[in-house]
Amino acid sequence: SEESKNALLGGAYFIRAYRYYMKTLQYGDVPLVLDELTEPKVDYYTTTKESIWLKMIKDLEFAAQHVPEANKVKGGQVTKAACKHLLAKYYLLEGRFDDAIRITTEIINGGVHKLCTERFGSNKSVADKDVIWDMFRIENKSLPENTEGLLLTIDRYGMEGNTSGTQVMYNALPYYGLTGVIKTPNGANGMSDAAKNEIGI
C-alpha cells in the first residue's frame, strides 16, 4: 500500500539522515550520494554540509509524517519519535530553534513517550536502586515499560549471538581498559582508569 511504502521510505530516509548527521559533524563537507550505485564510482565530489542538512531536513519532515509511532512498530524499527528527534537536531544545526522546540514538544506531548517514574524490569524489587538504574539494565532496555526509548537496538541479553552493545550508556572516550593499546607520541600508555593518574605526553 502507499502507506506502508511511505513508512518504509521514511525509515530509510532516517537511516541516511542519521549517517549524514554523523559524517558532516565529523568531517564537514562530504560527498552526497542520493542514488543507488550499481557499479564502482571514483569521481566523487563534496557537497557543502549546509546543503546536505537542507536535504536531510526535507527527508526527515517526510519521515516524521509517514513513519509510525513506537507502539505501532516492532522493536528495533525506526519510529516517528526518532525521526522527529533527529529532525530537531538538524533544525538546531540550521539555527531554526522555534522549529526544534515545536517538533520536540510534539514528542513530549504525543502520548507515546513519557518519563519513566515507576520501577520496572527484572530487578525492580531491589530496594537500594531506582528507576534510572532499571532503565539501563541490559535486559530492561527494550521492555515496553521503558517508555523513554525513542529508538531501540534489539540485542537480547543472555541469548546466543548477542553482544555487549546495549550495555554501553554513552561512549565519550576510547575504552580506557585497553591498557597498552593506545599510546602517547612518546610511547607511554595513553589510557588509564587509575585515580589521579597523569598521562605524560
Task: Give the label of every model feature segment.
Residues 81, 87-201:
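An aromatic- and glycine-enriched ligand-binding surface/loop that stacks and positions planar moieties
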Residues 1-78, 94-99, 109:
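Aromatic-anchored glycine-rich loop motif in surface-exposed flexible loops
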